[in-house]
Each structure stands twice: as structure tokens, then as C-alpha cells.
């Protein structure tokens, strides 16, 4: 199964390149929307770009600041700023950030994916798209950029978990060739509301 981007956006690779020790990244962009998907992979030896950000670390700090100040995080499913920061700090993990340059030279974090990559398997630990950017194709664009990068690192199988009631996310994953392989009963704790099952999905990538 080959990686395909079925959404409406055209992708191109930036010609800007710069070095920062061993911490490298690559960058792609949506032409007509001034949106870029930045990849923070501390283990990569590929060329990278950080657009308006000075370095890997300044981009990471900016992402964490935006995450911390966001009121749109799905905390009801157990994710918090602390969870995301610890995941981003783990050197086995890769962060994919979708950033838009708005009028007035203002930058907005539209979505992020944090993935854990070990040998030929990866797990998407956290997938988030801002509420005002959902159902626009941006989620698929971010997801497919992440899958392309994971495939380039030798990943074969990609796993993720999603709440059974999250129909929008379920449709996104199934449209992009993820298939259910199991269920984790009462995985998501929701306080007095009880707990909700998580569906485990897998997608097998091929060269």
C-alpha cells in the first residue's frame, strides 16, 4: 500500500536549508494557504528548515507555548500540557507541527502529531487539529506528511488509538487506510462520566 495524499492541497519542499548539530528536520508547505508542516526529529540526518523560527529548540519552545495556552486541547480524554511536553521531550519521539502564517505576520498552530518510532513500528501518541481547522483537509494533510516521514525512516506498521465516540477522527483514519485491529475497554477515563473504549488502528506502509 503506497502513501497517497488525497486532500486538496499541493505540497512542495522548501529550498531553505540550515544545520543545527545533529538535530535536523525537513519542511513542506501548502502553496495556497501559507501553511507548513514542520518535522522535529532529533535522530534524523536530513536537511531541514524552520521557516521564521531560529532553530529546532526555538520552534519546539513555541509549539509548547501554544499548546500550553490553547483552550482547545482534548483534556477530557486524558491529555494535558504535561503529557504532551514529556512526549515531545522523549528522543524516541517525533513531532509534526502544522503552522499557518496569518496576516500581520502572526503564526498559528493548526495541529500537531507526536509519534513514537521504534525500529520498524511507530505509534501516533497524540493527534490534534484545532477545532476551527477541522473538516478542511488539514488533518489529512498533517497525517499524510507524518506517514511519509515515518515511511522514509523505515517504519512498516503505524498504530494509533482513538475514542470510539470520536467519529470525525475514526472517519479520517479509515479514509487514510487505517484498519481496526483491537479494542481497549474503558481506556479513556472521563471522571463521573465513567470511561470510554479505545479502538486500536493499524496501517501498514510499503515502499
Model feature map: region roles:
Residues 129, 163-164:
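Short amphipathic helical patch at the helix-1/turn junction of helix-turn-helix
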Residues 151-161:
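Conserved GNAT acetyl-CoA-binding A-motif
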Amino acid at each position: 500500500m503506497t502513501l497517497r495524499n488525497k486532500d486538496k492541497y499541493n505540497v512542495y519542499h522548501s529550498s531553505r536549508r540550515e544545520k543545527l548539530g545533529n538535530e535536523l528536520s525537513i519542511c513542506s508547505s501548502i502553496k495556497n494557504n501559507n501553511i507548513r508542516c514542520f518535522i522535529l526529529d532529533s535522530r534524523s540526518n536530513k536537511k531541514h528548515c524552520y521557516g521564521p523560527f531560529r532553530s529546532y529548540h526555538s520552534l519546539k519552545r513555541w509549539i509548547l507555548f501554544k499548546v500550553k495556552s490553547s483552550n482547545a486541547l482534548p483534556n477530557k480524554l486524558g491529555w494535558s500540557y504535561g503529557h504532551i511536553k514529556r512526549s515531545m521531550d522523549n528522543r524516541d519521539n517525533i513531532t509534526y507541527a502544522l503552522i499557518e502564517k496569518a496576516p500581520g505576520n502572526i503564526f498559528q498552530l493548526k495541529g500537531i502529531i507526536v509519534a513514537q518510532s521504534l525500529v520498524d513500528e511507530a505509534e501516533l501518541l497524540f493527534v490534534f487539529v484545532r477545532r476551527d481547522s477541522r473538516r478542511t483537509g488539514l488533518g489529512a494533510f498533517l497525517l499524510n506528511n507524518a506517514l511519509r516521514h515515518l515511511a522514509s525512516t523505515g517504519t512498516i506498521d503505524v498504530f494509533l488509538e482513538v475514542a470510539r465516540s470520536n467519529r470525525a477522527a475514526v472517519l479520517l483514519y479509515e479514509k487514510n487506510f487505517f484498519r481496526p485491529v483491537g479494542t481497549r475497554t474503558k481506556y479513556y477515563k472521563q471522571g463521573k462520566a465513567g470511561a470510554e473504549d479505545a479502538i486500536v488502528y493499524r496501517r501498514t506502509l510499503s515502499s
